[in-house]
């Protein structure tokens, strides 16, 4: 029987990003792709944040991040805020450090009781870091488009790694006027992205405000993607089209992103909302090897 049978979980959302938080620090088990997909079939989520025993002194947990297709991700900003909310709520802490595949993340209570800040680390721009399948010296724009050659619908995205690959397409019109459900999977799986990519449409309202919509790698169309908001804010600042502190509007809500000048770390501040707590029924994993 799966060690997840009868185990408790918490369902949350980070401004619309559907999150399951699963604390396995008391269980020596690594969730399998089949188990992750089984959970998603009963408790729909965009990402599942699994807390495992920390590997280093001074950290709260090692976080494994699963997409609903069973694949793993290196980063999920909205999910991290949900984890932080749960941990702080139980321990009374106001700051903590967590381990992820993308590195150590420092987190703390935000400027209001329902706000949490996650230091998402330093963005990477090298074509091999993102990664891309071929060399681009300047990743502020790369050659990629959807639509006719002489009149592309989307073209020339900025690419950034926030521990996971992001492509940001700049648009002049409302981000909701584009058929992202159609273009998203094509771009996510484009050969230029050997590890696939998160695809974002972004409209710069002014230097302090950006609206965006994201097709999330391994999860599909989402109401919010925190790492995509970070990547978009950084990409806009690299192009000198936005300030380093920006207000981001996503379908599910609002985030504040700061690309801190003194050390190039990206700070994301937003809410985390509790929905319900439950336990996994053993039958859910009956067909899982």
From Swiss-Prot:
What this protein catalyses is:
(2S,6S)-2,6-diaminopimelate = meso-2,6-diaminopimelate
Listed under subunit, the entry gives: Homodimer.
Catalytic residues (positions): 76 (proton donor), 225 (proton acceptor)
The record's Pfam families line, in alphabetical order, gives: DAP_epimerase (PF01678)
Could you state one GO biological process linked to this protein?
A: lysine biosynthetic process via diaminopimelate
Q: Which residues bind substrate?
A: 17, 47, 67, 77-78, 164, 198, 216-217, 226-227
Write down the position(s) of the site called Could be important to modulate the pK values of the two catalytic cysteine residues: 166, 216
Tell me the protein's name: Diaminopimelate epimerase
Which GO CC annotations does the UniProt entry carry?
cytosol
| EC number(s) reported in the record | 5.1.1.7
> What subcellular compartments does it reside in?
Cytoplasm
Q: What pathway is this protein a component of?
A: Amino-acid biosynthesis; L-lysine biosynthesis via DAP pathway; DL-2,6-diaminopimelate from LL-2,6-diaminopimelate: step 1/1
State a single Gene Ontology molecular function.
diaminopimelate epimerase activity
Please give the organism.
Bradyrhizobium sp. (strain ORS 278)
Task of the protein = Catalyzes the stereoinversion of LL-2,6-diaminopimelate (L,L-DAP) to meso-diaminopimelate (meso-DAP), a precursor of L-lysine and an essential component of the bacterial peptidoglycan.
Question: Which family is this sequence assigned to?
Answer: Belongs to the diaminopimelate epimerase family.
| Keywords from the named record | Amino-acid biosynthesis, Cytoplasm, Isomerase, Lysine biosynthesis
